[in-house]
A protein has these predicted regions:
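Surface-exposed assembly/interface segments
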Residues: 1-323
Length: 323
């Protein structure tokens, strides 16, 4: 037997994968039955529970070719960098109750076909507030900004609400926000801005610069033509904050919580020692590094990433906390 002064200890570690950031959801709430024909009983509303789909063919098999869900799904899947999966759901519940029912599902971007800009302002603000509180990004479109005065006092807080001004007099395009979702949801978080995203299957608005400024000042974005491409005019949410910043902040919070929790799950015991603290710190740093690699974190003048994780060593903590 050979003798060695070196001992090699190899341990197989579990790789903590990234948690999915969520997929687009197309939802119709308040579904009602078709009017009963003379001599026939009233029909039961046809609804479809939350489910995920990987192609427009799968969506059409469930909803049919002409249903608005299928039309929106087709626009999403038509984009060059479309997401690999989307979710669809129809329900008799109200908009707000419908959202509450799918809160724990794996979705992030929302197209709510039953959101009525001509209806009660409270319905809009209830949906906006819920999406903001639960960090889900609502994409919606309107032909007018007059309704904005009803929630102007809170407009600056809506970092997760994207309003598209779109007045297509030909009515060839319905739910133009679907193209925006399809063009962006399949890309890495932090790797894009939402401005100048190339869109397929939609018509551009023809606006004077002063008109465009008016809509941007109101918190809207729209669809325009630039250098021969049809693109988004701006990349901000209703609050005026860039949507990629909101995405990055939400992603960091989600991934930090997830990866630190996985450390606790994958170890029978994470001791309150420097070693245990280092395990948690390592998980946090791995998230921050990925965020930097994806363009979410800037560099300092020396070209170094501007992030750090400060976990107090055991000796730096209060004695009472170590009991």
């Amino acid at each position: 037997m050979s003798l060695y002064d070196v001992t090699v200890n190899i341990q197989l570690q579990k790789v903590v994968k990234r948690l999915d950031f969520g997929i687009p959801l197309i939802m119709t709430a308040g579904v009602t039955a078709s009017p009963a024909q003379e001599g026939q009983e009233q029909q039961t509303p046809v609804t479809h529970a939350y489910a995920e789909y990987t192609s427009i063919q799968q969506v059409k098999e469930v909803f049919g070719d002409s249903d608005i869900i299928s039309v929106i799904a087709a626009s999403i899947f038509k984009q060059e960098n479309a997401p690999k999966r989307i979710a669809c759901c129809t329900t008799t519940a109200t908009n707000l109750n419908a959202l509450k029912a799918v809160k724990d599902q794996n979705w992030r971007q929302l197209i709510l076909t039953s959101l009525d800009w001509d209806g009660e302002s409270k319905d809009l603000t209830d949906v906006f507030d819920w999406c903001e509180e639960n960090k889900r990004v609502l994409f919606t479109s309107t032909k007018s900004t007059t309704k904005f005065t009803d929630f102007s006092a809170k407009k600056g807080t809506y970092h997760h609400i994207v309003v598209l001004y779109y007045n297509d007099t030909t009515e060839q395009v319905v739910f133009p926000e679907a193209a925006v979702v399809g063009a962006t949801a399949g890309k890495k978080v932090g790797s894009i801005t939402y401005k100048n995203q190339i869109l397929a299957g939609v018509l551009p608005m023809v606006l004077e610069e002063s008109e465009l400024k008016t809509y941007h000042d109101a918190g809207c974005i729209t669809i325009v033509s630039k250098a021969g491409d049809i693109v988004t005019s701006e990349g901000k949410a209703l609050s005026g904050q860039y949507l990629d910043i909101t995405d990055s902040m939400d992603w960091l919070e989600q991934q930090l919580r997830y990866k630190v929790q996985k450390v606790l799950n994958n170890n029978d015991k994470v001791e309150y020692t420097d070693r245990g603290i280092n395990l948690l710190e390592g998980a946090a740093i791995s998230v921050l590094k990925e965020a930097y690699d994806n363009g979410m974190i800037a560099e300092d003048p020396d070209g170094l990433p501007m992030y750090w994780a400060k976990f107090a060593k055991r000796e730096e903590t209060e004695a009472a906390d170590r009991v």
